[in-house]
């Protein structure tokens, strides 16, 4: 039975009744009497104790605990919160002659995000050169798409001010949210480490900054092979870039456990393939009444949530799941999902995604 702390008013009444039973005829309900003040004071103290007991009860269970207490649960189970990381990647610069680009040289994106060169680069010819730069500030904002223009903040001799991120920057991630941390903790408790089974690979992949969901395919290409794929839901494009795939593959191959300090990772003799899934959009066609902007947004959110929670590479999506998601939105007088009408399936290398909804 759930614990429900008594209200202050009920505690006051209970205390007054106790006084009345001990001192018949004392009438502690009279506000001008000393006994009434004592009853109020005692009830207030008791209310504070009950509220604290209620708070302690919430902290015992990770899913209801405050963030600070959730971190304590995570420490106990060996789950460390992923900290913010800075994006980095190759930047193509153009020089008019041989030159040296000193460490600390900075370039700026149009929206003000700044990137810095870690080590001095000596260039012995004119032309284009690829260098590696890192965002000054850690976080998701540092990730940059392909062919983005950056501009030198401080001019360097013989270096053209405009530079291009031909391959884009990746690796930037914000500090892990409490919800994502709780999800990883629950996974750790429900699927404890087991020497390299499929759940270990999922857990390892999700320990990498930016990774939110991951899947493992045992016997990917036969015995002794494993396939691992993942997505990064906090990005506008959730599908990982080659640099992200490389980071996850390196981490799974072997890494220092963040809690124990021991080297852990894939067992010897296992051939692991880490890959980025391909998007396979599902574009629903839905009739709703009334057709308001608010209902459209609510239905879109419900469908996106359903895709997040229920789809996986190599899985199937029944039309009834979309119908159930739409039916859960309040305010609809009528609706009909006219596509899909058949089960949507994906290969192990594909992930079904919520595409563009056509409103009828």
UniProtKB/Swiss-Prot annotation:
GO cellular component annotations, sorted alphabetically?
Answer: host cell cytoplasm; virus tail, baseplate
The record's function comment reads:
Component of the baseplate. Probably involved in tail assembly.
Q: What is this protein called?
A: Baseplate protein gp47
Q: What induces it?
A: Expressed in the late phase of the viral replicative cycle. Expression of late genes is activated by the viral late transcription activator C.
Compartments where located:
Virion; Host cytoplasm
Grouped into one coarse class, the protein's main location is: virion
Subunit structure, briefly?
Part of a complex composed of three DNA circularization protein N, three baseplate hub protein gp44 and three sub-complex wedge (made of two copies of each baseplate protein gp46, gp47 and gp48) that forms the baseplate.
User: Which biological process, per GO, is one annotated for this protein?
Assistant: viral tail assembly
Q: What happens when the gene is disrupted?
A: No tail is synthesized.
Q: Which InterPro entries match?
A: Baseplate_J-like (IPR006949), Phage_Baseplate_Assmbl_Protein (IPR052399)
Q: Which family does it belong to?
A: Belongs to the Mu gp47/PBSX XkdT family.
The answer to whether keyword Metal-binding applies is no
Taxonomy, superkingdom: Viruses
Q: Which organism is this protein's natural source? A: Escherichia phage Mu (Bacteriophage Mu)
Q: What are the protein's UniProt keywords?
A: Host cytoplasm, Late protein, Viral baseplate protein, Viral release from host cell, Viral tail assembly, Viral tail protein, Virion
Question: Which parts form a coiled-coil structure per UniProt?
Answer: none
Disulfide bridge map: none
């Amino acid at each position: 039975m759930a614990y429900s702390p008594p209200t202050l008013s009920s505690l006051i009444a209970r205390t007054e009744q106790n006084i009345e039973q001990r001192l018949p005829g004392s009438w502690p309900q009279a506000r001008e009497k000393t006994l009434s003040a004592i009853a109020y004071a005692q009830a207030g103290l008791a209310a504070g104790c009950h509220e604290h007991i209620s708070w302690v009860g919430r902290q015992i269970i990770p899913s209801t605990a405050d963030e600070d207490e959730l971190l304590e649960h995570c420490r106990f189970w060996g789950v460390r919160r992923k900290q913010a990381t800075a994006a980095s990647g190759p930047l193509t610069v153009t020089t008019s002659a041989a030159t040296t680009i000193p460490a600390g040289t900075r370039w700026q994106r149009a929206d003000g995000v700044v990137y810095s060169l870690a080590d001095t680069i000596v260039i012995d010819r004119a032309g284009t050169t690829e260098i590696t730069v890192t965002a000054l500030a850690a976080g998701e904002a540092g990730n940059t798409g392909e062919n983005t223009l950056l501009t030198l903040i401080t001019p360097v001799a013989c270096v053209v001010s405009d530079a291009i991120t031909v391959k884009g920057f990746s690796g930037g991630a914000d500090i892990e949210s409490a919800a994502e941390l709780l999800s990883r903790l629950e996974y750790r408790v429900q699927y404890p480490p087991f020497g390299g089974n499929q759940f270990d690979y999922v857990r390892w992949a999700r320990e990498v900054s930016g990774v939110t969901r991951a899947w493992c395919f045992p016997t990917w290409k036969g015995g002794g092979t494993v396939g691992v794929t993942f997505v990064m839901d906090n990005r506008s494009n959730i599908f990982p870039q080659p640099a992200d795939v490389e980071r996850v593959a390196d981490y799974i191959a072997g890494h220092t456990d963040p809690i124990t300090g021991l080297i852990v990772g894939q067992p010897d003799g296992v051939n692991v393939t880490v890959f980025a899934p391909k998007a396979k959009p599902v574009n629903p066609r839905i009739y709703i009444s009334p057709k308001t902007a608010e209902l459209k947004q609510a239905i879109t959110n419900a469908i996106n949530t359903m895709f997040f929670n229920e789809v996986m590479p190599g899985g199937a999506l029944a039309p009834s799941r979309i119908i159930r998601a739409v039916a859960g939105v309040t305010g609809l007088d009528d609706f009909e999902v006219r596509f899909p009408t058949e089960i949507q399936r994906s290969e192990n290398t594909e992930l079904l995604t919520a595409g563009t909804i056509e409103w009828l």
